[in-house]
Amino acid sequence: MGIGVVGVKLLLSPHALPAGHSLFFAVGAGPPHDGVRKAKRLNLSRDLRGIAALAARFPGAAVLAFGFGDRAFVLARHEEIGVAIGALLPSPGLILVTALKDSLEAAYGARYVVVLLHVSPAALDSIAWFIWYSLATKCGRRPPPYGPGPCSGSLFYASSVRYDGFYTCNTWAAEALGAGGLPIQAAGVLFAFEVMREARTLASH
């Protein structure tokens, strides 16, 4: 939802800016970045349409963070070489949803980079729908949690997307950005730094 070995997380908020844009966040590990300090508390003023049924499970959240990963690897209690190797093969995916009520600094600390991208409400909605279709839903209904997440305010959900060595958490994040119409190249993306590099380029324009 980490970087290097951890992966890119998507942080969504439907809070409308005066200019009529919404905010989208990509998070990765690395040195502190000024973007973190600019991202103060956000007010979740309305549900994201694509994931409205899911967002309703996290009342009071300012931001929802999403991360994709290999189910067996994510749920493993200990780091085992067999589980790590298994993650390179096509395997069931898992999505971690984390509700953030504090500032991004309090939630992620200085070791994470936060890149702020201004997108239109329509683009944010498309990204939300991409996430919804990545969940293992039945007849479009709100999926039940697969299990509790690693921290307070987080839940795991089964994914309809399969994870493998050529489709990682970072590939998924890049595809989500692309679903919102952002010029992000998802094909061939495997590592977090690739997504973060493109996100920084977009943020600088």
Name what the model sees in each region:
Residues 2-5, 133-205:
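Activation targets extended, charge/polar-rich intrinsically disordered C-terminal tails
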Residues 1-17:
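Membrane-interface motif at the C-terminal end of an N-terminal transmembrane signal
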